[in-house]
C-alpha cells in the first residue's frame, strides 16, 4: 500500500466520490478511537495508508504528541503537520476529537482543491492563519461543487471547536446523510488539475 500523500502527488485532485470515500473510511476509523476516548492528534495525508484495495488504515495512533508553540517555531519539520493543525491545538495545546475532524476537513479540502487552504513559507505564519482566519469555503477553489459537500467541509474546519461535529461518529453520520442526497454529477465532480 501507499500513503495518501503519495496518491495526492500522483493525482493532484480527487473526485468528490473518491474524496468522500477516503474521508468516510478515515472518520469510521477515528470513530472507534473517539469512542474509546483516544484522539489521534496528527491526522495528515502521510498518516493515512491506503492498502492494495485502496482502503484506509490510519497510522501513527497515539504517537503524536501535542505540538507546543516552541517546537513549531524552532523547526521547519512541522510545516507539514502545521497545515492540518486545529486552532485550539495550536493555541491551547488542547487535543480534542473535534481537532481530528478539523484535520480531516483540511485533508478533504486539499484532495478536492489540489492545495491546502492556507499556505505560508514558515510554520509560525501558517499556524497564525489557522488561529486567526476562517478556512475559505471550498467553493472558492472548486466552483460548482455540491453545496452540501461545501457545508460539510465548512463544519469540519470551523475555527470554533463547538461549531464542529462532536466526534468522528457524529461526523460520519452527517456524511452518510449528505451522501444520500448527492446526484451522479455531484459524485463525479472533480476539479481539473491546474498546472
Annotate each PLM feature.
Residues 71-83, 90:
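Activation loop
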Residues 83-186:
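C-terminal lobe helix-coil module of Hanks-type protein kinase domains
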Amino acid at each position: 500500500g501507499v500513503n495518501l500523500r503519495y496518491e495526492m502527488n500522483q493525482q493532484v485532485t480527487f473526485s468528490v466520490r473518491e474524496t468522500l470515500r477516503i474521508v468516510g473510511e478515515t472518520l469510521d476509523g477515528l470513530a472507534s478511537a473517539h469512542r474509546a476516548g483516544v484522539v489521534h492528534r496528527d491526522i495528515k495525508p502521510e498518516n493515512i495508508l491506503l492498502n492494495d484495495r485502496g482502503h484506509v488504515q490510519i497510522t501513527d495512533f497515539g504517537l503524536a504528541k501535542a505540538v507546543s508553540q516552541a517546537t513549531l517555531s524552532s523547526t521547519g519539520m512541522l510545516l507539514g503537520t502545521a497545515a492540518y493543525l486545529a486552532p485550539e491545538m495550536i493555541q491551547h495545546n488542547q487535543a480534542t476529537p473535534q481537532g481530528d475532524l478539523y484535520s480531516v476537513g483540511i485533508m478533504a479540502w486539499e484532495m478536492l482543491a489540489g492545495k491546502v487552504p492556507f499556505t505560508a513559507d514558515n510554520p509560525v505564519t501558517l499556524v497564525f492563519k489557522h488561529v486567526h482566519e476562517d478556512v475559505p469555503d471550498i467553493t472558492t477553489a472548486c466552483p460548482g461543487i455540491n453545496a452540501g459537500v461545501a457545508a460539510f467541509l465548512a463544519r469540519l474546519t470551523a475555527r470554533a471547536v463547538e461549531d464542529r461535529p462532536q466526534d468522528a461518529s457524529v461526523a460520519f453520520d452527517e456524511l452518510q446523510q449528505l451522501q444520500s442526497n448527492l446526484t451522479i454529477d455531484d459524485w463525479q465532480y472533480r476539479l481539473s488539475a491546474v498546472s
